A protein has these predicted regions:
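Short alpha-helical segments enriched in small residues
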Residues: 1-162
């Protein structure tokens, strides 16, 4: 899976560099893996300036300015929270592209309605924010890797379609 992460990161780098885009990330369940995959590319400072790892609800509210009431009402792992993570980090950092992830990597923390492996990814630009729901299988690390891969793929797709 590391090879796929590296391939998608390089593709994101090339896509952003070609279009002169600055990307920022807001991560929860990946714990910085997404940002790490981007900065592993030489020259990444040309396209990447910042990242937030907001693992707790308090930090999502404080750092990303997501109303705590919204998080409590919908849960941190929800489409609306992922959407707000992408939207708010995009605006706060004055970036061209944002990638946000929130999910349940396990092995605990899941429920019947929100099982381990549930992840929401949101990718934002000035014009639109796309959200996508995923269900991944595997251990904690595998879920985090799959989330990183799919977040990068979605970001690449959004860039290439615009």
């Amino acid at each position: 899976m590391w090879k796929k992460i590296n391939q998608e990161s390089k593709k994101l780098f090339d896509n952003c560099l070609k279009r002169n885009l600055i990307v920022t990330t807001a991560e929860s369940c990946t714990g910085g893996m997404l940002a790490s995959s981007i900065v592993s590319i030489s020259g990444s400072s040309n396209i990447f300036h910042s990242s937030f790892v907001t693992y707790s609800n308090e930090m999502k509210s404080k750092m990303l300015e997501i109303p705590i009431e919204l998080i409590i009402k919908n849960g941190a792992v929800s489409e609306i929270v992922a959407y707000n993570m992408a939207s708010n980090v995009l605006n706060l950092m004055k970036a061209d592209l944002s990638i946000a992830v929130t999910g349940i990597a396990g092995p605990g923390g899941g429920s019947e309605s929100k099982p381990v492996g549930l992840v929401w990814v949101a990718v934002g630009t000035i014009k639109k924010i796309i959200t996508k729901k995923y269900f991944f299988k595997g251990n904690r690390l595998e879920i985090r890797k799959e989330t990183t891969i799919e977040a990068l793929k979605l970001a690449n797709r959004i860039i290439e379609e615009s």
